Amino acid sequence: LYDADQGILLSGDHVLPSITPHVSGVGNGADALKSYIATLDLVADLPGVRLGLPAHGHPFEDVPGRVDAIKRHHEERMHLLQQVSSSLGAATVQQLSREIFPKKHWGVMAESETFAHLEHMVLAGEAERREEHGRLLYEVAPPS
């Protein structure tokens, strides 16, 4: 919800000031991460945004800058998946997630976000998914 006259964006959980919103890959089979990034771009393109009002945390001023930071976070997460996959080889979502979130395992949230990144990379041709013995295994292409 955006009040263009006042430059105030009710960003809810979509853009948060200090944490990245959870992107779940569980759903209708679409590329959840690609969809989320596309909507972030729409928010960044809103003219004259002065203030973001999030569902969590304090109001914040640099909405386009925060959008850029969230997008960078997801790029960094995919780069980390490339690194982890190169050392593990083909692995399950759970195995990859535990490597990416080693200090504090966030359980299902971490796994569903890892799944969203992996599925995005599969659809972009940057990773492969296969089934072996009833388990989905992912292998991410090394950085080019």
Per-segment meaning from a language model:
Residues 1-78:
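Metallo-beta-lactamase
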Residues 80-144:
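C-terminal regulatory/interaction regions
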